Amino acid sequence: IDVKSGKPWLANTTGGVSGPAIKPMALSMVYETARTVKIPVIGIGGISSVEDALEFLIAGASAIQIGTANYIDPSITIKVIDGLYRYCKKNNLKSLTGLPSLKK
């Protein structure tokens, strides 16, 4: 709220929850959903590093999406892709499908 005008800074008054704040809930939902459905699940919510991406993939996501972190670092997607490549190389994985999975 702008204390001088008394009006909200955001057009919709309250805004939404995104970025790191949503990650624990999003990760839990990916885990639960991936165990329940037989279609690919895309992990979204609070991904801002290669470690975050790996968590979502191990939880059962078939793919990930980076959103809010792009506002902070427009090159974050490339950094995460490069980091996933380095992770696979370091761990002798031919692809991300070789990651351990909590999806059972």
Q: What do the PLM-derived regions correspond to, one by one?
A:
Residues 1-39:
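Glycine/Thr-rich beta-alpha phosphate-binding loop at enzyme active sites
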Residues 46-47, 51-80:
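Glycine-rich phosphate-binding active-site loops on the catalytic face of alpha/beta enzymes
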Residues 37-41, 61-62:
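Short, well-ordered coil/turn segments that N-cap beta-strands
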Residues 26-29, 76, 80-84:
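A general structural detector for well-ordered alpha-helical segments in enzyme core domains, enriched
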Residues 18-22, 42-46, 69:
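Glycine- and other small-residue-rich loops at beta-strand/loop junctions that grip anionic moieties
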Residues 23, 82-104:
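Extended, intrinsically disordered, low-complexity segments
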